[in-house]
Amino acid sequence: MNTTVDEGEALAEALRDVDTESVDVLVAPPFTHIDRVARALEGTEVFLGAQNVSEDTYGAHTGEIAAEMLADLSVDYVIVGHSECRGRGEEDATVAKKAVRALEVGLLPIICFGESEEVYGSAERVDFLKKQVKASPTDMKDLDKITLAYEPIWAIGTGKTADATDADEVIGSVRASLDPAIRGKVRILYGGSVKSSNVAGFVAKENIDGVLVGGASLKADEFKAIVREATHG
């Protein structure tokens, strides 16, 4: 939960000239900011996302946001299974349901997966991550619309960053566990204390298709620098 509506709109306005020629650029503001941010980005190639969605359809689900509501606001992508949501008890099955709901209304889900520091240091690390991904709706026909995002929980908002080579190897193992028919269709991102000074090292790796940026995206100049470094190194 960051920025007021006015601040979010100003940030979006500052991103109107961000370089989108070689990379896909997405912003995912809080629900309350989406309409104003969408207007600020109108006419640009910047995609609009949301930070979460309900696994339910319309009905008596007070406080929830239905996928249809996001589609009405011209949202393109929606993040599901973020580590902060999983930390509040969200389970793999719920994440999968949210991804399916998003796809049903034409939204593109970004499905997050990641491990705690305890799991990171154990022999079960890769199997744990594969289990999370296996719960995703990877048997559906429109797999090219699904993006996965590896975000080690111990690197989210802590200033700690995974080693790029290690992240690449882990993502490569997860990709290899997918059905051969879909491996090349699914984009897998890295997220975890990404900034302009380290992004080039991640996107240069074979198995990392992009990055999911957190706190560094709250400053327009830094966000633009991340895009620039990801594009040109």
Report each predicted region and the residues it spans.
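Active-site loop-to-helix "anion-binding N-cap" substructures in soluble metabolic enzymes
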Residues: 1-233
